[in-house]
Amino acid sequence: MPEEADRRALVWMNALSVSRPDYRIVHEEQLLAKRHAETSDFVSVVVEPRWPGGSSMEVYGRQDLSIHSLSDGFVESPYLRSWRVTDALQALRDKPNHAKIKAQTTALAKKLGGIEELRATIVVGFANPLTEEDVERISSRVPDVALLSPPRSDSRLPISWDYSGYCNARGFDDCNPDIRTSLTSGFRKWVSLLDSDDANALQSFDLNLSELRNSARQGLWYGAVYNAHIELVAELAADPRVSVILVGQVALGQ
């Protein structure tokens, strides 16, 4: 694939993922091979709602999409509708009601706790921004998504970073041990590869290069998303550093 198209895949696919923590870019080996057949005018992506359960589960709402080049470096990003996890992420901005929401979520999880193999997409907001090391002390469960900013203006979701399934799916060596075990380090690596020529493409995904660089420099987590058994809600809610917790979606899974 031409180097220019590689660059666009690096910027576009990650920008879509970073701007929409309610969805997951499906990083699969066959998709990487498919990318090599693309022209520099568009990049194919497979996107699915951030559904709870194992990676082998068939997810309702999975879509084959493409990101197209426009003039002046802008791109046409795919439309992704809001759904329950989107609403949970938006609720992070409702700080006056955090305690009430947390209590309601804890009560709901207690009722659902008796259902065997019930998994949930759990959205957490922290009372104050935390380092990744502090987040790891809250639970032994590793978060699936780091929320590296608060919810942004104009209903934009938090800046985020998640794990990819394959080493080169993001356009750089995501299996490098220096970054593989740290979502913060992975995000910082991506931001370090961006330059001013990417500004218009990033704007197409409601992202700002200065904003991304600031988040990378600070390296602080404002929240996290977990794909876990419903019982994790009680553990997370018990920590005073967690100001709000929501269950975005539940499903039976492994």
How should these model regions be labeled?
Residues M1-V225, H229, A234, S243-Q254:
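Loop-rich non-cytosolic ectodomains and luminal regions
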